[in-house]
Amino acid sequence: MTHNRLFSAIAFTFILLLAFSCKKKEDKVEYNYLNGTPKFSIPAYVQPGEVYVLHPREVTRPSDDTSTDGIGYYWSVSPITTKKDTVRTEKDAASVSADYTLTIPDTLCTITTTCSAFAEGYYSSTSEASSIIVKPYGEDRSLKGITYPDKSKVITDSRDSKKYYYTTAAGLDWFVENLAFEGAGKPFLDSPAMADIFGMFYTWNEAAKACPAGWRLPSNEDFLALHNSLTGAKNTAAKTTFYGNMGDCMADAYLNDIKLWEFWPGVNINNKTGLAMIPAGYATINEDGNARYYGSTYYYTCWTSDEAGSDKAYYRYVYADKPDMLLGSGSKTDFASPVRCVRTSE
């Protein structure tokens, strides 16, 4: 009898749990979906002090929704903010802005900005974008590992007052960093904060006239002389690959403490020349003038002054896994590369 009672109690409990579980499923609320996502635009790299007014794409209720309420929006920026910032509620008039003003703080980190559109009875619609905060200038700048052999060797570009250190190699003065003149070209990933870190990316037509007065693009002959000075060779063929010793021109640089050149045992990065080549990569330009960027952390590229026919020009590049300087050619209008400027040594 006792066993029967125990069995009955267990069975009764199981039935109750099953009934409760079914009821929970029956009570589960299903929401509808809003139309669209609140997408917005912010550069992939930003710098302290910049102010961005972020404008989300409009989100709407389904066409069969007869409610007179609107759509609410809230924002958050991790790890900067810990609370959601509601800029518009459902009851607000449509004229109330859903925009969000973001001021970039003075710190080095990756921030994730999130915008959510919400309405009662609907799942929230969310969009997010990540940005890396970098510091282009100062002792705590993001780009580390660039050395200036002689700090007295510096020029000021009269067009924008930017300063460039230079070093002397093979009878020429060479910029130690990529040209950052913003009167032409595009910054890396279309992020103005990167102009003074990776330099600007120029088409050859832009690069041909981008250097400051008294400076010019290096020729293949200039790169040949540079390589001969490194190897002691007496090569005379300028339009070819130069083998070996390019680690003498590469800088073991870091961006926000992230190593730029990937390590390869066959490449001895030591920057003996002070040229401080870094792997900023290259870009292609489509017919609408928009750029796509490739090869950062893998390629150093630099335009030469030499044309390769009516619509192409030569550029030099160094790949992470080889101590060589290779030769390529690209469209004068659709291929974009950083630039180093040279002049005859004074």
Q: Residues of each region from the PLM?
A:
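Conserved positions within compact, well-structured domain cores
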Residues: Y137-E346
